[in-house]
Amino acid sequence: MSDENIRQIAFYGKGGIGKSTTSQNTIAALAEMGERIMIVGCDPKADSTRLMLHSKAQTTILHLAAERGAVEDLELEEVLLTGYRDVKCVESGGPEPGVGCAGRGIITAINFLEENGAYEDLDFVSYDVLGDVVCGGFAMPIREGKAQEIYIVTSGEMMAMYAANNIARGILKYAHSGGVRLGGLICNSRKVDREIELIETLAQRLNTQMIHFVPRDNIVQHAELRRMTVNEYAPDSAQAQEYATLARKIKDNTNLTIPTPISMDELEDLLVEFGLLGGDEEYEKAIKQDLAKRGA
């Protein structure tokens, strides 16, 4: 396998942040620019390719391997499907809830794809990875040097920023051994007060950039109901142009850095600074008011 010229990128982000939606819309825009791309879904929900394939959920490598008895019994054509603009689509899958490690599917899938020539004739490979925790399995694309550029999907909400900081910590751990770098934060807007300024400040603290701010628009949900990307559903819309702009920024991005994660105290101080979290005095005042109400 010769993959030296392939741009291997990964989208990480906490569950529910819109990571898979953002990544698929961005990849669709890249494909429209003529790029040859494969998506490797690394989320147990197996929803990383459904907008590209116009389907509910793609059958995963791990599911088929369990049915057959071993991953060696699979054919590449069974798990690699072609979607919108000829984007190749694969879902690694995960075990039954409460049994085994979800990261195992990622390791199994990538090894299978490599051994069967799936990485040939590509410009980009995009890994869509669950990012609430960067455990051994979910860190596999980073740890093994597969994904070289990480884009973190976040918002101005505290838990999304907390997850982004944790992911940055995971990138730092493998930056020197695997060569992985942080490409930037993608702010998928939740309409939080001063959200652009907040994420730009977080990006500075993490030694990276806010590569793009994706505004909130109901057209995204309208497209998802039809299992389509916005680019396909409403190509002339303002939101489609936002994803095209993000895709162009990623394509041209050379600002790849080793992140500098911050402490929980620093993150909370940042939220206090932007008025999204009360300081100690406000906290104590709120507690006193609550106790007074209970005593009344």
From Swiss-Prot:
Cofactor entry: [4Fe-4S] cluster
Maturation and modification: The reversible ADP-ribosylation of Arg-104 inactivates the nitrogenase reductase and regulates nitrogenase activity.
EC assignment: 1.18.6.1
PROSITE patterns cross-referenced by the UniProt entry: NIFH_FRXC_1 (PS00746), NIFH_FRXC_2 (PS00692), NIFH_FRXC_3 (PS51026)
InterPro entries given in the database record: NifH/chlL_CS, NifH/frxC, Nitrogenase_Fe_NifH, P-loop_NTPase
Cofactor note: Binds 1 [4Fe-4S] cluster per dimer.
Record-linked Gene3D superfamilies: P-loop containing nucleotide triphosphate hydrolases (3.40.50.300)
Record's keyword terms, sorted: 4Fe-4S, ADP-ribosylation, ATP-binding, Iron, Iron-sulfur, Metal-binding, Nitrogen fixation, Nucleotide-binding, Oxidoreductase
GO biological process, one term: nitrogen fixation
Organism domain of life: Bacteria
Residues recorded with modification ADP-ribosylarginine: R104
Binding site for ATP: G13, K14, G15, G16, I17, G18, K19, S20
Catalytic reaction list: N2 + 8 reduced [2Fe-2S]-[ferredoxin] + 16 ATP + 16 H2O = H2 + 8 oxidized [2Fe-2S]-[ferredoxin] + 2 NH4(+) + 16 ADP + 16 phosphate + 6 H(+)
Primary enzyme class: oxidoreductase
Entry binding sites for [4Fe-4S] cluster: C101, C135
Pfam annotation, one family: Fer4_NifH
GO molecular function, one term: 4 iron, 4 sulfur cluster binding
SUPFAM superfamilies: P-loop containing nucleoside triphosphate hydrolases (SSF52540)
Homology family: Belongs to the NifH/BchL/ChlL family.
Assembly and binders: Homodimer.
Functional note: The key enzymatic reactions in nitrogen fixation are catalyzed by the nitrogenase complex, which has 2 components: the iron protein and the molybdenum-iron protein.
Protein name, per record: Nitrogenase iron protein
Gene label: nifH
